[in-house]
């Protein structure tokens, strides 16, 4: 399918998220939408996918104007989208998730599980996805869950596949594997729109690049464009790609962890005899492939998990927090941003002010008798 977006404008109140955007995606092309966070890339693709209705402009597929009233219409027209936050049901199998919404049925409307499995196996084998149709989503690593989302789109005969920040949750190895999958899909005739702000990945896999800044298309480029040229288009000024980093002068120890072991949710040892110190004014990186204990260690420091055995201990600003509650850890000066901010960090139905006061709602300035003092939210 040849996809053409003409004059797409989308407003949210006074904010113009997309301003008269023109975009052409050729059949079998990997087309990168490059821009900073908040540039309007995802909004544009949500218009394409039928999640938003454009205030102006139109969409054409192979020269035929489209009018999508929702994602169902977009999918029927051959548009698929893999969102940054996956749309999967954790307690369902791969086959059940892929079939959801267009389930193959037998007599009396009973789901044909064998056919659902077969569809997953066929797509998986065709593109080398190596996905078990009977595996539960909650048991799969993030990279495999992303492949399930791609299989789900392909099972609905997607001819244009939108990938929204697909590498944000992937390891470098998984990123390389995804790029190879993208190349295979493009070779089979599928057009791919790759939303990202990562220049290295764009140059490695894209056939063509469109740069969006502040809701407008500011340029197009080939992947052989220089990194500095692309970066300047993204931000609207010259970008210095090298930084003279001054050597840090760390102060006293503020966080000390000694011989800590922690179990994961399956009662397996995720953290084994770990010790480290963080000094005042220091940035300490804990590197490793996802699933190797980093999350469990962070949750222990917050007070969500207890240490294993009696030998391990941790202290914050000289105060032991080995068995502290979450409130005690926060009151001791620990800040925490969870791995999955959408699921574990924010309440999407709450306002910004309400989210900001969540972990402080028990403090006197936010209380009024036994109730929360909502008037204090914006002070």
Regions found by a protein language model. Name each.
Residues 1-379:
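Glycine-rich phosphate-binding loops of nucleotide-dependent enzymes
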């Amino acid at each position: 399918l040849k996809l053409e977006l003409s004059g797409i404008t989308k407003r949210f109140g006074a904010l113009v998220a997309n301003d008269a955007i023109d975009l052409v995606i050729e059949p079998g092309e990997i087309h990168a939408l490059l821009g900073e966070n908040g540039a309007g890339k995802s909004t544009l693709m949500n218009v394409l996918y039928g999640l938003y209705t454009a205030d102006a402009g139109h969409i054409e597929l192979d020269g035929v104007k489209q009018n999508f009233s929702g994602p169902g219409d977009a999918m029927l027209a051959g548009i698929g989208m893999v969102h940054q936050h996956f749309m999967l049901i954790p307690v369902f199998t791969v086959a059940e998730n892929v079939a959801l919404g267009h389930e193959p049925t037998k007599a009396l409307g009973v789901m044909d599980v064998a056919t659902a499995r077969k569809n997953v196996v066929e797509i998986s084998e065709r593109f080398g996805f190596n996905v078990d149709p009977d595996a539960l989503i909650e048991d799969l690593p993030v990279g495999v869950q992303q492949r399930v989302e791609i299989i789900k789109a392909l099972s609905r005969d997607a001819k244009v596949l939108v990938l929204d920040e697909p590498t944000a949750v992937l390891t470098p190895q998984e990123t390389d594997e995804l790029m190879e999958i993208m190349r295979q899909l493009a070779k089979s005739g599928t057009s791919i729109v790759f939303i990202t702000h990562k220049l290295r990945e764009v140059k490695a896999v894209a056939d063509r690049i469109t740069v969006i800044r502040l809701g407008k298309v500011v340029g197009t480029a080939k992947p052989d464009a220089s990194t500095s040229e692309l970066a300047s288009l993204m931000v609207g000024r010259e970008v210095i790609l090298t930084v003279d980093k001054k050597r840090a002068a760390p102060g006293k120890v503020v966080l000390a962890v000694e011989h800590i072991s922690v179990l994961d949710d399956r009662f397996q040892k995720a953290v084994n005899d770990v010790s480290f110190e963080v000094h005042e004014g220091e940035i300490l990186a804990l590197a490793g492939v996802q699933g190797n204990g980093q999350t469990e260690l962070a949750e222990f420091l917050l007070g969500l998990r207890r240490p294993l055995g009696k030998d391990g201990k941790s202290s914050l600003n000289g105060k032991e927090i080995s068995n502290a509650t979450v409130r005690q850890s926060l009151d001791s000066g620990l800040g925490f941003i969870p791995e999955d901010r959408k699921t574990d960090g924010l309440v999407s139905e709450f306002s910004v002010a309400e989210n900001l006061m969540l972990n402080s709602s028990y403090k006197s300035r936010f209380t009024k008798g036994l109730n929360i003092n909502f008037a204090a939210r914006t002070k």
